[in-house]
């Protein structure tokens, strides 16, 4: 019973309850537990390697670091200085290398891929905070999962990412069609970012 009440509280706080039918992301509040995988490749695009019943560091259900950007940053679950007492986890994104030309990148593959429709507007909301090293911005968009990396939409969150939790909202319009795109978040400077209660919906 306590677990059910906690999940209800989490859904209410993150705004997921009202968007349950339209939420496009998998594990948007980072509360989902990772499960060990035996004799299979982890990740929707074959990322990772074969495991013997254990998970490597940085595995968070629904979230990946795209190929080619693995050396620039790492992701992990954080349980400290959380957004609210109802939250048990947040995403810690430790960025060691990043610039405007070569930003650090993380992606969410959606529940069954993210359908992108040309001309449709999407809204991305998220809570974020940063350590004192991070002076950059956060950009977000929809990108092809194929090797060509086609961008269907992209926008940058307004305002600096501060030391205290703050909510940000980004809207963008898709410029192409894709049955199974992914949400991509980019950061253009080194530092540590914390994200929680993210949400992507189609308007």
What name fits each language-model region?
Residues 4, 21-203:
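Extracellular and organelle-lumenal recognition/adhesion modules and their flexible linkers in secreted
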